[in-house]
Structure formats: structure tokens, C-alpha cells
UniProtKB/Swiss-Prot annotation:
MF terms (GO), sorted A to Z: holo-[acyl-carrier-protein] synthase activity; magnesium ion binding
Species for this entry: Burkholderia multivorans (strain ATCC 17616 / 249)
Protein name, entry field: Holo-[acyl-carrier-protein] synthase
Compartments reported by the entry: Cytoplasm
Enzyme Commission no: 2.7.8.7
Reactions accelerated catalytically: apo-[ACP] + CoA = holo-[ACP] + adenosine 3',5'-bisphosphate + H(+)
Length: 146
């Protein structure tokens, strides 16, 4: 496997909370996929702070993923097309759907994700990998001399 791209993102949890409050909850429905939304509602029902932290980490993971694949938030990368879920062990993993899944499969791209949060911030890091050579990837690192 070769690294296709990397992405990282950090978000202030209070900003996510403010947007969620301002939109009456619609922000979560816009950003989260169906499985993420179920987890969000369950966590938020137990603890408002944990629900908001979950939303913030998933928002951050989508931003980091969009950077790792080089698209930013442009089609076929959409908020709901990528979900970050957790294995029973707690390990996070990403699941793509629809046209994004097709786009990734055509390029042989898989990804690894990690997320973390504290009271004020949520952060994520994504490594996108491929078994196929990237069409515009350099073959070597160039070095300039003074």
C-alpha cells in the first residue's frame, strides 16, 4: 500500500454546540450519516456534552478525510456520504456510500482514521492509502539546494 494522502482537522467543540443550537438540531442531520445520527442521539440522550463531542469528532473526521483524498468538500465527497463508526473494541473506521464509495473504489483508496476530543477541542487524523499509483504523485521527493 502507498499513502494517497493525509488529512488532519481540529474543531472547537463550543462552535459545534453553537451551530447545533442555532439550527435547532438540523446541523447534526446535515452532517451525520444514518448510523452516526443514531449514535449521536443515543449519546446525547445520556449526556449532552458527550453527544456534542461525538458530533464534533465526526465533523472533524469528515474534514480530515476530505483533505486526505484531495477533494475538500466537493462532489462526490459529501457530509453524509462518509461515516466514522466504531468497532466493538472502540477503534474508529470509515464507511463510504454512494458515489463517494464508487470514486474511492475506482482509485483503490482505503483509509485509516483516528479521532480524539477533550473539553474544548476535537481532532482527527486520516491516512488515505491506495494500492494503485496516484496519477500526479511524485516519484521521489525533490530537494532544493541553497
Amino acid at each position: 500500500m502507498a499513502i494517497y494522502g493525509i488529512g488532519t482537522d481540529i474543531v472547537q467543540v463550543s462552535r459545534v454546540a453553537a451551530v447545533l443550537e442555532r439550527t435547532g438540531g438540523r446541523f447534526a442531520e446535515k452532517v451525520l450519516g444514518p448510523d452516526e445520527l443514531r449514535v449521536f442521539h443515543a449519546r446525547r440522550a445520556r449526556s449532552e456534552a458527550r453527544g456534542i463531542a461525538f458530533l464534533a469528532t465526526r465533523f472533524s473526521a469528515k474534514e480530515a478525510f476530505s483533505k486526505a483524498i484531495g477533494l475538500g468538500m466537493h462532489w462526490p465527497m459529501t457530509w453524509r456520504a462518509l461515516q466514522t463508526l466504531n468497532r466493538p473494541s472502540g477503534e474508529p473506521y470509515v464507511v463510504a456510500s454512494g458515489e463517494l464509495a464508487d470514486w474511492l473504489a475506482a482509485r483503490g483508496i482505503t483509509a485509516r482514521v483516528t479521532v480524539s476530543d477533550e473539553r474544548d477541542y476535537a481532532v482527527s487524523f486520516v491516512i488515505a492509502e491506495t494500492g494503485l499509483p496516484a496519477p500526479d504523485a511524485p516519484t521521489a521527493v525533490s530537494r532544493t539546494t541553497p
